Amino acid sequence: MGMGKGYFVTGTDTGVGKTRVTCALLHAFAATGKTVVGMKPVAAGCENGMWPDVELLAAASNISVQREHINPYALVPPIAPHIAADRAGIEIDLEVIRQAHLELKKKADIVIVEGAGGFLVPLNDHEDSVALVQALGLAVLLVVGMRLGCINHALLTAHAVRAAQIPLAGWVANRIDPEMAVFKENVLALEQRLDCPLLGILPYDQNHDARDLSSLLDIARIGMSS
């Protein structure tokens, strides 16, 4: 066991496939013999008494841990986290998340933390996801939802990550628009400009099993100079 390491997964927007990629990353690391656990510090959007992202991350983890460590804050409405928390009469506390993360690091070799929404999403009145990543001391992996406009969103996000002096350790192209024109050219444009390794390209198919998708990710490239 011992103190594990890990990454923070952010995306170019909400709904770009962060959970899909995080689960695939967990399976990829597990395939190398590591103990892995996914964490969703703040989940917003309850369906039938469950938070789907949290369920998927727990299922993709290969050790059993307390649910409140995987997901310290579970908010019912699928809206911006700080607004959902405010409506519930609570304030998201980064120290609570940090302590939960420490507990996971004691138990797993790799902890992969999935953010809420995009990189600059507020978590309370004075802190955002940037402050959370800094508090956890993690490098960022960027999920680019491949659709028209994604180049701008990806470069803006990369700029924000680096402006906060946080390492950008890799990116994943996740195809979310099957009709996207000049797909390959967009991937190439991002490869040329993001200045971090492309870990893989995930196809458009909502039914893909995360374990199958994991074979499309080259985790050995994480953190390499591109």
From Swiss-Prot:
InterPro entries noted in UniProt: DTB_synth_BioD, P-loop_NTPase
Record's function text: Catalyzes a mechanistically unusual reaction, the ATP-dependent insertion of CO2 between the N7 and N8 nitrogen atoms of 7,8-diaminopelargonic acid (DAPA, also called 7,8-diammoniononanoate) to form a ureido ring.
Pathway(s) per entry: Cofactor biosynthesis; biotin biosynthesis; biotin from 7,8-diaminononanoate: step 1/2
Family from the record: Belongs to the dethiobiotin synthetase family.
Gene Ontology CC annotation, any one: cytosol
CDD domains membership: DTBS
EC number(s) recorded for this UniProt protein: 6.3.3.3
HAMAP family the UniProt entry points to: BioD
Subunit structure: Homodimer.
Protein name: ATP-dependent dethiobiotin synthetase BioD
Active site positions, chain numbering: 40
Pfam families, per the entry: AAA_26
Annotated catalysed reactions: (7R,8S)-7,8-diammoniononanoate + CO2 + ATP = (4R,5S)-dethiobiotin + ADP + phosphate + 3 H(+)
Positions that bind ATP: 53, 114-117, 174-175
Domain of life, per lineage: Bacteria
The protein's enzyme class: ligase
Alphabetical keyword list: ATP-binding, Biotin biosynthesis, Cytoplasm, Ligase, Magnesium, Metal-binding, Nucleotide-binding
GO biological process: biotin biosynthetic process
Localization, UniProt: Cytoplasm
